[in-house]
Amino acid sequence: MKTLLKNGTLIDYKTNTFEKCDILIEDDKIAKIEKNIEEKAEKIIDCTNLYIMPGMIDIHCHLREPGFEYKETIKTGAKSAVCGGFTTICPMPNTKPTPDSTIILQKIIDEGKRVGLCNILPYASVTKGERSEERRVGKECRSRWSPYH
């Protein structure tokens, strides 16, 4: 499937420029970025007066799941993030239970993948239960996940 974004203002962070252009997307990948693309597409979106930019990363957000779902869930938080242009969010560890083990962290990561709206990379509590008493998570995480996954 082809989607054509017409007349948008592309924000290019590498060159610090704003440029009016069209973007052709084929099979969920950017195929062309040019002025005045005249190619047929199944979907054409008029982006006049709109900005097009890479997805942003929120390195400090608060999802309340697990434990406080009455405030917010991973799904509702991810929906809000995507509506604001964020494709990756990093929730703080103030949930119940506290993400102070790889088991709890993996549950949050798995729920984020199940929801499937954006990348969810949760912070871990450095100490057990956020009580500054017993350091726990560092070694466990290093043994389970590479820092560059």
Name each model-derived stretch:
Residues 50-115:
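Metal-associated gating/positioning segment near the N- to mid-region
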Residues 138-149:
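Positively charged, low-complexity/disordered segments
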Residues 45-46, 91, 122:
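General beta-strand structural signal in soluble alpha/beta enzymes
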Residues 101-105, 131-136:
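Distinct, well-ordered alpha-helical segments
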Residues 1-4, 10-54:
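Histidine-rich, glycine-flanked metal-binding segment
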